[in-house]
């Protein structure tokens, strides 16, 4: 159990049979009446966001989440298969569970999988990955005066905006949080 006074951004709670993550919170102490905590909660399963108010000191169950490092071994149809390298247990995830992390996932890459019981809530990739450019337009000489960018397709199929000097076959570093180009490798 956790008190509403202890809510912080990122705190996970169980409410109505679901896991919710505190996105925003505000402790309010009105001049008249009792204090309360106004929160914005995001459902960890569906992604929906709701606003909820709790009385100050109200206790709610804290969600017990387990984070396990697993390796992406292969893709079976439309499912992504991950293996726990300690217990050799497999977890099969569909594209909806993967979210945007599917754009930067390579075979044999390790990722942190967040579980609530036996249900997968989130896939957390490393903050940056090295990917090979498989498709991009050739850069034109003298076209760099403005420091422009061009679209490039990387080995996972994701599109990344890269500087004009990047060519096919080069390895680049990509931020998995927003898909931005970080540099050459």
Curated annotation (Swiss-Prot):
Pathway: Protein biosynthesis; polypeptide chain elongation
GO CC annotations on file: cytoplasm
Keyword Zinc: no
GO biological process: peptide biosynthetic process
Pfam families: EFP, EFP_N, Elong-fact-P_C
Listed Gene3D superfamilies: 2.30.30.30, Nucleic acid-binding proteins
Compartment list: Cytoplasm
GO molecular function: translation elongation factor activity
UniProt entry tagged with the keyword Protein biosynthesis: yes
Keyword tags: Cytoplasm, Elongation factor, Protein biosynthesis
Family, per entry: Belongs to the elongation factor P family.
HAMAP family, alphabetized: EF_P
Function, as annotated: Involved in peptide bond synthesis. Stimulates efficient translation and peptide-bond synthesis on native or reconstituted 70S ribosomes in vitro. Probably functions indirectly by altering the affinity of the ribosome for aminoacyl-tRNA, thus increasing their reactivity as acceptors for peptidyl transferase.
Full protein name: Elongation factor P
Naturally occurring in which organism (per UniProt): Rippkaea orientalis (strain PCC 8801 / RF-1)
